[in-house]
Amino acid sequence: VLCVGGWLLPLGQEDSLADVVATYRRLPAVAFQTVPVDAQPITVRTAVTGGRTYVYLVNDSPWQTEVSLAMSTPATCPVQDVAGRRSFAEVENAGPAASWRVELKPWDLVAVSLPGESASVRDVRVALPNDAREELAARLDRLQVRAMALAQQPPLDALDNPDFELPANTDGSIAGWESDARGGAELNVDPMTPDERNQVVRLHSAGGTGTVLRSAPLNVPDTGRLGVWVWLRSTQAAAEPQVRIALEARDRGRVFYRYATVGHGESVVRVGPGWQQFFAQFDDLPLSGLDDLRVRFELRGPGEVWLDDVALYSLNFAEPERVELFKIITSAQLKLQNGAWSDCLRLLDSYWPRYLEAHVELSAAQLAERTAQRPRPAAPAAPPAEADRGGVLRKIQSWLPSRFFR
């Protein structure tokens, strides 16, 4: 089944797809066999039926390609387009050492029929434009720079008072933040570093109800991700409070609520007497229909906790995630070296590379630096030896922090 954005042909593109669709419809309804030759981005399949041999070629790439087939054919071998829409060159030297040349447009499908049932394809040679490899190498460069840039993403400028240094409102409430009716959220000078420029928030509750501090509404990030960093400490080691780092919003009128727990409880990180940075990652934010998004900190039950310096990140990737990204890059690099054009392109067009292209901006300086580091690519030779494969892996490894490989 062929589907392009739905069950019907895309409106306005019928002319560009007419040859492909007509060819597909006229293929005989029999099983075709793939010619066992790696000639990416071209796939060649053949079938014999009704006293004729059918050959079709698919160009799985955005480049115009020239294909040469080494064949065995009858002595007289006219080439017929199965759709009757296009004219092709004749077979050269028809017979046991015949050859046939054909040019395929980007994403093209060509199918022809040959007389008799004895014709066969022995080999496939593909010639791509000179800039095809350069184009793939450039995309790989940009992907590498984007992946490395994930470790240096700045926090979002989304909170009005992330470090709590703004003066309190006239009613004593915390600027840029809201507490619930139970109270229990107040500004204090950090007693561990008494400095009037180092204000922190003290959340406290004497009863069992706890308290909540929430931010003003935020713009919903278009990445579908939001990481919350915050510094916490508690002086109550004997009765350590439980704290939730949470997001709240309305998702098409329904409550949206996600949280991570620290402090008291099993399998959670403890909140000690010294300042410690905590992190909660939320990866399932809806890309539409979400509004009134807020960060919230909940003191669950009685106790006391101090918090400071809240930071939000929309592109925070954990180390295991970055390692997986570099595995994709490594694989694409090896595919490119081996001339596996379609495999390389398929990796570059997969979800996470496309995601980084959409959300990680690159400066001209970053691109220029990476381009200057890359040698001009040569044409692919024979498959590299194992030592060469290790060289690529060592190169990728050198881009990652050493802690990835302990």
Give the location of each predicted region.
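Extracellular and organelle-lumenal recognition/adhesion modules and their flexible linkers in secreted
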Residues: 127-406
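Short, solvent-exposed loop/turn segments at secondary-structure junctions
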Residues: 8, 14-15, 59-63, 109, ...
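Acidic/polar loop patches that form or flank catalytic/metal-binding clefts of enzymes
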Residues: 8-14, 29-35, 67, 79, ...
